[in-house]
Amino acid sequence: MALPLLQLQAAELALPGRPAPAPMGPFSLSLRAGERIAILGPSGAGKSSLLRLMAGDSPASRGQVLLEGRALAHWDRAALARRRAVLPQQQGVAFGLPVELVVSLGRVALGADPGGERILREALAAAQASHLWGRRFDTLSGGEQARVQLARVMAQAWDQREGLLLVDEPLAALDPGLVQALMDGLADFAAARGHALVAVLHDLNLAMNHFERLWLIKQGRVLADCDALPAALPLLEQLYDMRLRLLRDAQGLALLPLRQAA
């Protein structure tokens, strides 16, 4: 059997704390190429920290994280950029750069770029942002900037196969009308190339309808690694300390929070 694409082997992450660093984990998780996994949990649970650990942006204080069987610490940055693309929650300010140059930053680590402008335009189209070509990034709305950054990550992974996409709240700043279309587009993009897609989300309905597995994180630990199926409802209620109602029709699943008794 082929190795998992990514493995966390009892990996811990030391976080600043008082009076001593408070470790997150240990995490023992794995995923394979082509899988779609949503990371869910309350605010402050450690979802973004887990994603940084998986990306190699925050090194493990104990245990290790393996990409294709090799510890992330042993990958050079250029080789790592060719195998995984990351969309963090906090984006660096791109000042007055034109949109197409921001998107092209995803291609920098790949060296020679025979696709050139074609890939940049196709990535912007996939993020429903073609009309932003030529605009200055710092003049865009928050939602427009989010789409450009999504296009940057897609451009980085455009001509790779069976890589890893790590995205942190990729659709948080977008209007509801765009969210479903872009989530469909991101999932289709990953599936067409065999990429594993891991997304930190707050939207339970996106997670249940667009992802196969759920990693439920609470207080820096894994509460559950489960399938995104109705049977996960009790675990989600435990995760958020609230009651949920599950609705289902031909269009998919919907989870509604129930008002707590006074």
PLM features per residue range, with description:
Residues 63-71:
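Conserved ABC transporter NBD signature motif
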Residues 229, 233-262:
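ABC ATPase nucleotide-binding domains
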Residues 163-169:
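Catalytic Walker B motif of ABC-type/P-loop ATPase nucleotide-binding domains
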Residues 215, 219-229:
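Conserved switch/coupling elements of ABC/ABC-like ATPase nucleotide-binding domains
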Residues 123-139, 157-162:
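Conserved ABC nucleotide-binding domain
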Residues 55:
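Helix-to-loop junction immediately C-terminal to a conserved catalytic motif
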Residues 201-202:
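H-loop/switch region of ABC-family ATPase nucleotide-binding domains
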Residues 40-42:
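The feature captures the beta-strand-to-loop junction immediately N-terminal to the Walker
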